[in-house]
Curated annotation (Swiss-Prot):
Comp. bias (Basic residues): 127-136
Main location group: nucleus
Ranges of biased composition (kind: Low complexity): 110-122
Ranges where the record places region Disordered: 21-54, 94-136
Biased composition (Pro residues): 25-36
Biased composition (Basic and acidic residues): 41-51
Cellular localization per UniProt: Nucleus
Protein name as it appears in the record: Dof zinc finger protein DOF4.6
Entry GO MF terms: DNA binding; DNA-binding transcription factor activity; zinc ion binding
Zinc-finger ranges (Dof-type): 53-107
Record's GO cellular component terms: nucleus
Amino acid sequence: MDTAQWPQEIVVKPLEEIVTNTCPKPQPQPLQPQQPPSVGGERKARPEKDQAVNCPRCNSTNTKFCYYNNYSLTQPRYFCKGCRRYWTEGGSLRNIPVGGGSRKNKRSHSSSSDISNNHSDSTQPATKKHLSDHHHHLMSMSQQGLTGQNPKFLETTQQDLNLGFSPHGMIRTNFTDLIHNIGNNTNKSNNNNNPLIVSSCSAMATSSLDLIRNNSNNGNSSNSSFMGFPVHNQDPASGGFSMQDHYKPCNTNTTLLGFSLDHHHNNGFHGGFQGGEEGGEGGDDVNGRHLFPFEDLKLPVSSSSATINVDINEHQKRGSGSDAAATSGGYWTGMLSGGSWC
């Protein structure tokens, strides 16, 4: 179809005109003032400042409306700025205000608390210093009292408190005095120089541990005695109690107490007692002086027991045979050196 044949009545209109004709614009309406909602129709308007109420306490007009008590319009609550009190209209004046007390200046309260804290801090070091001085004074007085009663207390306090035994200075003087008295009682007839004094001086610088070590070392030698004092150690500066100058040891097969440790000589223990007695009667040069007087403890022996002892000794001599010469020199070296027969 040709365009010339189109109807001429059709007129093309712009799109804007079509839109405006189909969608008309709404006309603005005038705004109306909104009315506040009424609560039951009984709520009154808040009193204005022009209607200030006098304070019933100070009759001041410097008051302020706060709120309605119990949400009742008949009990408005006010606050007086002059006397800083609350009251309710239609009620009684309350001396104790509700809600945080009376309004006071918080700065003054904080400043007073700071002053009190500073005062307490300043007085606290003084009291601590006074207590410490008093404590030191009591300690000094107690220490002086103890040292006055016992002069050796100061020496013990300077030592190590962890030691399980007393320091050497506390036992040294008492032990040396005891040894010195024993030497004076046993050697009254001897006018020569007492070697015990020299040995006691050397014992001052030693301890009991050195004595045990020397006994264990000397127990390995052939001339040592069971639990006896060292024999060959003549050095005054060496360890142990050097009393070999005064108390001489017994024979090689007998102890310091006179007991025989040889099964084949001196007839056992009985022979040890007899040998010790003979050595004591013969002189100090052979067997030395015994530490205990066994002659005072000697019991009377009957004839029957004597014959039994002789038979036992003869039986031992027959049984030993040729081994007697080889084992005649055997002795007990002591518990400290291992506890064995040599």
